[in-house]
Protein backbone atom coordinates (compact mmCIF):
# COMPACT_ATOMS: atom_id res chain seq x y z
CA UNK A 1 0.00 0.00 0.00
CA UNK A 2 1.39 3.39 -0.95
CA UNK A 3 1.35 6.42 1.27
CA UNK A 4 -0.45 9.16 -0.68
CA UNK A 5 -0.10 12.11 1.71
CA UNK A 6 2.68 11.85 4.33
CA UNK A 7 1.67 15.15 5.99
CA UNK A 8 -1.95 14.06 6.48
CA UNK A 9 -0.75 10.70 7.79
CA UNK A 10 1.63 12.39 10.27
CA UNK A 11 -1.03 14.78 11.59
CA UNK A 12 -3.65 12.05 12.01
CA UNK A 13 -1.03 9.88 13.76
CA UNK A 14 -0.33 12.75 16.19
CA UNK A 15 -4.06 13.34 16.81
CA UNK A 16 -4.77 9.64 17.41
CA UNK A 17 -1.79 9.29 19.76
CA UNK A 18 -2.95 12.34 21.74
CA UNK A 19 -6.44 10.85 22.12
CA UNK A 20 -5.05 7.57 23.46
CA UNK A 21 -2.82 9.45 25.90
CA UNK A 22 0.62 8.61 24.54
CA UNK A 23 3.54 10.81 25.57
CA UNK A 24 5.65 10.41 22.42
CA UNK A 25 5.10 9.35 18.85
CA UNK A 26 7.35 8.32 15.96
CA UNK A 27 6.48 9.78 12.57
CA UNK A 28 7.78 8.20 9.40
CA UNK A 29 8.61 8.86 6.66
CA UNK A 30 10.18 12.20 7.56
CA UNK A 31 10.29 15.16 5.18
CA UNK A 32 11.28 18.82 5.26
CA UNK A 33 7.63 19.89 5.10
CA UNK A 34 6.68 17.71 8.09
CA UNK A 35 9.67 19.11 9.98
CA UNK A 36 8.59 22.70 9.29
CA UNK A 37 4.99 21.96 10.34
CA UNK A 38 6.29 20.39 13.58
CA UNK A 39 8.44 23.51 14.18
CA UNK A 40 5.36 25.77 13.89
CA UNK A 41 3.35 23.46 16.18
CA UNK A 42 6.18 23.54 18.74
CA UNK A 43 6.40 27.34 18.58
CA UNK A 44 2.72 27.64 19.53
CA UNK A 45 2.98 25.05 22.32
CA UNK A 46 1.01 22.19 20.77
CA UNK A 47 3.93 19.73 20.95
CA UNK A 48 7.12 19.49 22.99
CA UNK A 49 10.57 18.72 21.65
CA UNK A 50 11.03 16.81 18.41
CA UNK A 51 14.11 15.35 16.78
CA UNK A 52 15.07 13.80 13.46
CA UNK A 53 16.44 10.26 13.62
CA UNK A 54 18.26 8.97 10.53
CA UNK A 55 17.33 5.33 10.00
CA UNK A 56 19.09 4.92 6.66
CA UNK A 57 15.83 5.33 4.73
CA UNK A 58 13.59 8.39 4.75
CA UNK A 59 14.19 9.08 8.45
CA UNK A 60 11.92 9.31 11.48
CA UNK A 61 10.77 12.19 13.71
CA UNK A 62 10.41 11.50 17.43
CA UNK A 63 7.84 13.94 18.86
CA UNK A 64 7.04 14.60 22.52
CA UNK A 65 3.30 15.11 23.04
CA UNK A 66 1.93 17.54 25.63
CA UNK A 67 -1.77 16.62 25.46
CA UNK A 68 -2.79 20.01 24.03
CA UNK A 69 -4.03 18.99 20.58
CA UNK A 70 -7.75 18.50 20.06
CA UNK A 71 -7.47 18.01 16.31
CA UNK A 72 -4.83 18.40 13.63
CA UNK A 73 -5.27 17.76 9.94
CA UNK A 74 -4.00 18.52 6.47
CA UNK A 75 -5.95 20.81 4.19
CA UNK A 76 -6.55 19.28 0.77
CA UNK A 77 -6.52 20.69 -1.84
CA UNK A 78 -3.86 23.24 -0.91
CA UNK A 79 -5.97 26.37 -1.31
CA UNK A 80 -4.19 29.61 -2.30
CA UNK A 81 -5.07 32.38 0.15
CA UNK A 82 -4.55 36.16 0.22
CA UNK A 83 -3.92 38.14 3.40
CA UNK A 84 -7.46 39.54 3.29
CA UNK A 85 -8.99 36.02 3.07
CA UNK A 86 -7.46 34.46 6.20
CA UNK A 87 -10.52 35.22 8.34
CA UNK A 88 -12.80 33.32 5.92
CA UNK A 89 -10.59 30.23 6.10
CA UNK A 90 -10.22 30.59 9.86
CA UNK A 91 -14.01 30.39 10.18
CA UNK A 92 -14.06 27.30 7.95
CA UNK A 93 -11.35 25.20 9.61
CA UNK A 94 -11.05 26.43 13.22
CA UNK A 95 -13.79 26.07 15.87
CA UNK A 96 -13.62 29.64 17.23
CA UNK A 97 -11.98 33.00 16.53
CA UNK A 98 -8.35 33.13 17.73
CA UNK A 99 -8.50 29.44 18.77
CA UNK A 100 -5.98 27.30 16.94
CA UNK A 101 -3.75 28.03 13.96
CA UNK A 102 -3.76 27.55 10.22
CA UNK A 103 -0.36 26.53 8.88
CA UNK A 104 0.55 28.29 5.64
CA UNK A 105 3.31 27.70 3.11
CA UNK A 106 4.51 31.11 1.90
CA UNK A 107 7.37 32.43 -0.20
CA UNK A 108 9.16 33.16 3.10
CA UNK A 109 8.73 29.63 4.46
CA UNK A 110 6.17 27.70 6.49
CA UNK A 111 4.43 29.75 9.19
CA UNK A 112 1.14 30.21 11.01
CA UNK A 113 -1.61 32.39 9.56
CA UNK A 114 -1.02 34.89 12.40
CA UNK A 115 2.61 35.41 11.33
CA UNK A 116 1.56 35.68 7.67
CA UNK A 117 -0.98 38.39 8.55
CA UNK A 118 1.68 40.32 10.50
CA UNK A 119 4.10 40.11 7.56
CA UNK A 120 1.34 40.91 5.06
CA UNK A 121 1.87 37.88 2.82
CA UNK A 122 -0.40 35.15 1.50
CA UNK A 123 0.37 31.58 0.57
CA UNK A 124 -1.13 28.11 0.43
CA UNK A 125 -3.00 26.50 3.31
CA UNK A 126 -1.43 23.18 4.25
CA UNK A 127 -2.74 22.28 7.74
CA UNK A 128 -4.76 23.31 10.79
CA UNK A 129 -4.23 22.62 14.50
CA UNK A 130 -6.41 23.37 17.52
Curated annotation (Swiss-Prot):
State any GO CC term: ribonucleoprotein complex
From its record, what is one biological process in GO terms?
Answer: translation
* One Pfam entry name: Ribosomal_S8
Organism superkingdom: Archaea
* One example GO MF annotation: rRNA binding
Q: Which of UniProt's keywords are assigned here?
A: Ribonucleoprotein, Ribosomal protein, RNA-binding, rRNA-binding
| Record flagged with keyword Endoplasmic reticulum | no
Complex and partners = Part of the 30S ribosomal subunit.
> Which protein family is named in the record?
Belongs to the universal ribosomal protein uS8 family.
Q: What does this protein do?
A: One of the primary rRNA binding proteins, it binds directly to 16S rRNA central domain where it helps coordinate assembly of the platform of the 30S subunit.
> Protein name, please?
Small ribosomal subunit protein uS8
The organism named in the record is Pyrococcus furiosus (strain ATCC 43587 / DSM 3638 / JCM 8422 / Vc1)
User: Could you read off the lineage of the organism from its UniProt record?
Assistant: Archaea, Methanobacteriati, Methanobacteriota, Thermococci, Thermococcales
Amino acid sequence: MTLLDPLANALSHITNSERVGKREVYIKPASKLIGEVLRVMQKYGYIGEFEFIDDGRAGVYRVQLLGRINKAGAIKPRFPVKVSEFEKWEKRFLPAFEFGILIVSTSQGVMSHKEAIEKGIGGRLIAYVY
